[in-house]
UniProtKB/Swiss-Prot annotation:
Cited InterPro entries: AP_mu_sigma_su, Coatomer_dsu, Longin-like_dom_sf
GO cellular component entries: COPI vesicle coat; cytosol; nucleus
Keyword presence, Protein transport: yes
Protein name stated in the entry: Coatomer subunit delta
Keyword Cytoplasm: yes
Amino acid sequence: MVVLAVSIVNRGGKAIISRQFREMSRVRVESLLSSFPALVSEKSQNTTVESDNVRFVYQPLDELYIVLITNLQSNILQDIDTLHLLSQVVTSICSSLEEREILEYAFEIFTAFDEATSLGYRDNVSLTQIKTYLEMESHEEKIQEIVSRNKEIEATEERKRRIKQLELQKKEAARRAAQNLPSADAYESIGYQTVNTTFATSNVEDESAMESYHAAAKASSAPKAKGMQLGKKKNTSLLY
């Protein structure tokens, strides 16, 4: 048997979901499914119809149909058995067989279809095995979701920690810069010492000038020493 595609359609033949197992274009699948309702008779008890070199094996799901599209050489009994298995899978996954519910659980349904059929050939699996596999997949997805959420939380905490660390570094840098600047008292002390030094220098210069002036005055007022004059006659008198 070769299953070309499995689809869930409404009564008008519009595909809600469809899974192709062999190379078929979407247009081709939609064209085949749109012709399907016209081939189905409400009074007929048959679950197979044929058209355009393909066979439709179908089963009602309330207001919907689950349909296998197979080639004409496929084993009808095996196809019907596969169809029953897939319909049980759908009813076990979805709580109600409505279009909205089918779309909501489309991923799980596709996964179950792939477990039951490989490249169009029926795999030797039971409904229990498929459900177990789906539960394992769901459990792994939950674990992965938890791991991803924990990673996001850790990344958020790391960003907060880095922001806080940068703020502390900025505060520390500002504090050190403030400590290295001289205070107002230091500025006043430096100014006072400069003025005092200037005045002290001026006083020393004034005292040196006064000492030089007094020394010059004393030198000018002192009596001049007379030296010996040569060649000048002395006025002398002889006394007898």
